[in-house]
């Protein structure tokens, strides 16, 4: 019987630990974005859907893939989330207990746009 490999949608293999930490971060960042009100200087509300989180092999970097909601420009959203990543990371640190909290990087999820 062949052992099943954990492949992400980009083809590279991820360990079970990476998958568990990615799902934990995904659920908690989505909760943070729902519970918190993130505004820019013009009081524009940014809402996003977290579609996937990919952790590096050493779990020090987490790439968060987001889709904008409410007709928001995706580049504006990722720039805004990148600018506020320390506040999001701080809130994430209160929710999860990991030895090292990964650095967050936000990217637009284009996987659904290509289909």
Model region roles, listed by residue range:
Residues 1-61, 67-115:
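Charge-rich, low-complexity N-terminal segments
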């Amino acid at each position: 019987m062949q052992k099943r490999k954990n492949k992400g949608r980009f083809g590279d293999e991820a360990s079970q630990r990476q998958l568990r930490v990615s799902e934990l971060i995904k659920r908690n960042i989505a909760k943070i974005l729902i519970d918190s009100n993130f505004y820019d200087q013009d009081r524009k509300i940014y809402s996003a859907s977290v579609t996937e989180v990919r952790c590096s092999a050493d779990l020090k970097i987490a790439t968060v893939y987001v889709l904008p909601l409410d007709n928001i420009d995706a580049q504006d959203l990722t720039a805004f989330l990148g600018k506020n990543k320390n506040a999001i990371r701080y809130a994430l640190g209160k929710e999860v207990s990991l030895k090292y909290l990964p650095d967050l990087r936000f990217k637009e999820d284009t996987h659904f746009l290509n289909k």
